[in-house]
Amino acid sequence: KLGLALNCEIERYNYFATENDAQIFYDELVYSILNQACVPNSPQWFNTGLYEVYGIAGKPQGHYFVDPKSNLLQRSTSAYERPQPHACFILSVDDDLVNEGGIMDLWVREARIFKYGSGVGTNYSSIRGEGEKLSGGGSSSGLMSFLKIGDRAAGAIKSGGTTRRAAKMVCLDLDHPEIIDFVNWKVEEEKKVAALIAAGYPSDYEGEAYRTVSGQNSNNSVRVPNNFFKTLDENGDWELKARSDGRTMKTVKAQALWDQINYAAWRCADPGTQYDTTINEWHTCPEG
């Protein structure tokens, strides 16, 4: 299926100089896959070749592709003529509740990706913290309340239909007002699980105890800049900044925050650490 699908693309765009070269590529690819010398990612298995081999087109699902002839972005007219073969996507989210690109729209965009077996990661640092003022009056319910909605949405979707669950990464900058709650999110949920298990509920991951609590459908990471480590070395205070106006909402000891990150990672394997400054220093396409 995969080999034939790739062969169709090779013929369509004349990637090889001769038919013999194309046949050699096909034969070597099929041999390599059958002997597990190389295998593609999961979405390739799920999606690629369904149209070419079985004639399955599927309804359009809001995907886009770049036409190689015109170099223009076009909306896909079916699900599998231009399938979703990539394993990982990065989505942004605006500090907006219901408009396109905002929080509720993100769950729809994630669902589209999960449906075809791919994973998604998002940095949620743009969303204002609990208690920050809203433009229409009142104050924000905070980031954590929305993360729990996204967690439930991801848990309701088994990526790829019947093959795998949603793959989801949640990132947060270390100066977000709710960083401490985020760091300890899974720690607190694991305490609830332990209490439920002690009360007689099964301990397996698909059991009622884990289905009851939140935070079980993503891997979480904190974005750590170099200036945090400088503050840590100096045993200084770390400022948590409002997303709406940049003011300092709270000050915590850098060492205390670092200790909580390490304890949480030991206790429940989250959050991971992403070294923001170093990652961007090594960025090969900083203007991209």
Where would I find each of the regions flagged by the language model?
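Extended catalytic cores of very large enzyme megasubunits
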Residues: K1-G288
